[in-house]
Amino acid sequence: MADSDDEYDRKRRDKFRGERSDSYRTERRDDRRPVGGSAGARDEWAERNPFRGGASAGGGGARHRPDYSDYRGPGARPRYGSPGRDLPPAKRMRPDWGDADLRPNPRFGGYDPYLMQAWNDHYQSMHSAYSHAGHAPPVRESIGGGGDTLTQPAMLNLKQFLDTQDENISDSEVMRKYTEYKTDFKRQQLNEFFVAHKDEEWFKNKYHPEDSVKRSDEQRGFLQRRTDVFVELLENGTIGSVKVDSSQGDALIRVLDTCVIKLEGGTDEDLKVLDEKPKDPVVCERKAEPIESAKAVEKTINSPKEEKISEGDPLPAIVSPQRKTVKSVNSDEENWDDEDAENATPKKELGEDSKGTDSKPEDKQLNKKKTKKRKRNSTDDDSSSSESSSSSDEEKLKEKYDVEDGLRAEQKADAEKDRHEATKAKQEPESPKLQELEGKEIVEPKELDSKSNTAENDDTLKSPEISPTPIKGTDNGDDNKVEEDEKKPSVDEIKVVETETIDLDKVKNGQPRALHRTSSIFLRNLAPSITRAEIETVCNRFTGYLRVAIADPLVERRWYRRGWITFMRDVNIKEICWGLNNHRLRDCEMGAIVNRDLSRRVRPANGITAHKQVVRSDIKLCAKIALNLDERFRLWAEVPTDDSHPSRADESTENGSGSTYGFNSKNPVLQNITDYLIEEASAEEEELLGLTGENKDTDGEPIERDEQLISVLDRLVLYLRIVHSVDYYNHCEYPYEDEMPNRCGIIHARGPAPVRVTNNDVQEYIKTYESKLQQFLTKTVLLSDEEIKDLGAKDPETEVEKFVQANTQELAKDKWLCPLSGKKFKGPEFIRKHIFNKHEEKVDEVRKEVQYFNNYLRDPKRPQLPEHPGTSKRTESESARGGGGGYRPPMYPPFSAMPYGFGPPMMGGGRGGRNFPPARRELPLEHQRRLIGYHDLDAPANSDMFD
């Protein structure tokens, strides 16, 4: 019964096979063994030994029992296949770098070369060090060929390095050579890292002579724009009217939103949107006017062309044929069936209203088929539902388009107002144009029909590519006029577009825009090779794309990055997210998910920050940070200097002409700041009255607030937050905030103050907080030329000479070849002249490459792989185990071949082909220790003795 084919086909035993113990399997298999138990054991050893098959199966181990598919024959692929022989399923192609447990790298089989101390890899590594059945141990991948790993390769310690040297070498010579080895090892790691990442965009933006300058100019432009907005708000009293207290959260959010609207190019008219509250009457309008609500629902699903037409004219005849095309490209039919069922009744009414329009009979037939199909779905749903199905449908509709997206109701209400105003305003001025167009329609019906056919075909073909136009059209109506001239649509489309241009101008002049609200998508997985331009090309196909932000790569994520894509608020962000998930860049799943809105924008800090002594200390720290950041980016400098490297500004301020506050800076928040940094105390009075600080230390003193000091501090805190994106009370910086969905999203403010506070608590808080802000207080100083020489800096002229020599080839006597052009010359000096005259751009590329590499070395915070834990933490006993030898193989797999030809592999089994350990070398005197003899008194007489 257990061996029947039906039992195998049901695959119920597959998922429990790995959970049964060895004893259970042994008992079940005893009756099937031959009489000669040894022969059966040998036959089944390959299936029962967990260490067999590790090398052939990629380190994953073989099955403990025969596969059911072997008995079953060809059929469906088993669900629980071997990881070494079967490809992983499609949804498991995401890399494992995001996991915190540091799972082994699949490149290296079942173990990772730099995580060999892990318990899961111990048995595999110990097994793979031995050879089985004449097969050599598996060869490890070289460090430079297979890409980056989590750490650098392990460096030899002194004892391992001694085994590579001659036995007669002196101690001083050993130490000198070992120092050279460590220096060369570091140089090689820096060079390998540079070669591996020099073609990636994030690396070029940091160190490339041209790209880094462009990036720094772009960031300086962002900072200058933020500075202008802050000064404007400071002058009109917006900054001075708010305090950075958690109790004034609404006022702080209003200030941040005002900054965002100004940064987006908004006007004072757009700031009125901050006074408007979310509209509740939208639900009532939806119940009273089902047609309008259906249009609002369709607006979020339709293509950009439909969106543009529905805003100008409520005629649905032009909308219906395009909706099918866009859904087939950007959406999935299975995911939108529910919405079709919900919208069946309103769309039927729309179809009846559109009978009087100029739509084609083919389009009408398509609409009828759609409505019949939706009717069928809706009747099936109604037959199985209760009497309250209509109300539940409305609740689903509200939850999907109002509750989930939160603020979309406000945008819809604004669109309804705009539509009503547009219909009132367009009637009188549009009448002569409409008459002329109608006359043209009567005179030339054939030409218009042909143009309408071509326009519809163009729309169906180009529907995913014209998506950005409606959103940008809300800011400028001229873009829509250009579309009219290019596409030449039919009469009805011309009416719609013309009325839309007029309406958009009125909306721009009279209706405030909520520029501070956006929708965004988070990309969890971006390969280092993916560029910003590639992401922008993909996103430009969707409606309302604004910008993209890409984070810096992290070593623990295997240099993969994260990204945020920002769209306008009124787009269907879920449909866009679905389209991005169906798109792959460079064979990489981006992992797009919808980014939620910020939950708490104002977050409380420690209430002790309101104490007068702490406030004065915070003013001092804020002034230092502001001065340091202003000098780094030269925001308030009189004459900006041109530098070849973006970080060169740090060197110009190293000797610092602005070390005092307010004197050498034109920053308005730093003017007269020294008046508030001088501490005052009634020390004489306390001494005469016998008042000491003992009572304050034991019982504490109440929180003392100085409103004047607090107002000065608030200006500094808001300046750092708005201009430099530094959240002072969270002691952190929000990087690349100008490209993020929320340009001024979160701020930390002073929380509720405690009743009493002791002097020790105040001093401890001040000391701790200053240590947390050291990253902003210290100036970044680039390494000097002498320091980067030790790291392997290159000379431009030397590298150019190497380039010339590499492109000078001698073919025969007095016959030389230049590989760059293929021309032949009589001597090398002619090739040299030829290269400098005809290939000057390639010589310049060599010089730029040298400067590129030196810029990387000059950065003290340069990215690089972390050191191997064995380099610094491995004890001598662990190192000695890997010394090699023929008697016992090493406990761990061998590393890659050692750089610079230093004799044997790092932890290999002896030198070359020898099968015995190398001669033991003596350590220098400072590393030697006295050997202690040992003799076992209970051992027999012929045993070994160690004296």
From Swiss-Prot:
Biased composition (Polar residues): 654-664
Annotated Basic residues bias: 367-376
Residues annotated with Phosphothreonine modification: T300
Matching Pfam families: ARS2, SERRATE_Ars2_N
Modified residues annotated as Phosphoserine in this record: S82, S303, S331, S354, S431, S644, S647
Ranges where the record places region Disordered: 1-101, 295-493, 641-664, 855-890
Range of residues in the leader sequence: none
Source species, domain of life: Eukaryota
Compositional bias segments (type: Acidic residues): 331-342
Matching InterPro entries: SE/Ars2 (IPR039727), SERRATE/Ars2_C (IPR007042), SERRATE/Ars2_N (IPR021933)
A GO cellular component annotation in the UniProt record: nuclear body
Keywords: Nucleus, Phosphoprotein, RNA-mediated gene silencing
GO biological process, any: regulatory ncRNA-mediated post-transcriptional gene silencing
Composition skew (Basic and acidic residues), residue ranges: 8-34, 41-50, 295-311, 345-366, 393-450, 478-493, 642-651
Residues found modified as Phosphotyrosine: Y80
Cited PANTHER family: ARSENITE-RESISTANCE PROTEIN 2, SERRATE RNA EFFECTOR MOLECULE HOMOLOG
Quaternary data: Interacts with cbp20, Dcr-2 and pasha.
Family stated for the protein in its record: Belongs to the ARS2 family.
Functional summary from the UniProt entry: Acts as a mediator between the cap-binding complex (CBC) and RNA-mediated gene silencing (RNAi). Involved in innate immunity via the short interfering RNAs (siRNAs) processing machinery by restricting the viral RNA production. Also involved microRNA (miRNA)-mediated silencing by contributing to the stability and delivery of primary miRNA transcripts to the primary miRNA processing complex containing drosha and pasha.
Name of the protein in question: Serrate RNA effector molecule homolog
Highest classification ranks of the organism: Eukaryota, Metazoa, Ecdysozoa, Arthropoda, Hexapoda
Gene name of the encoded protein: Ars2
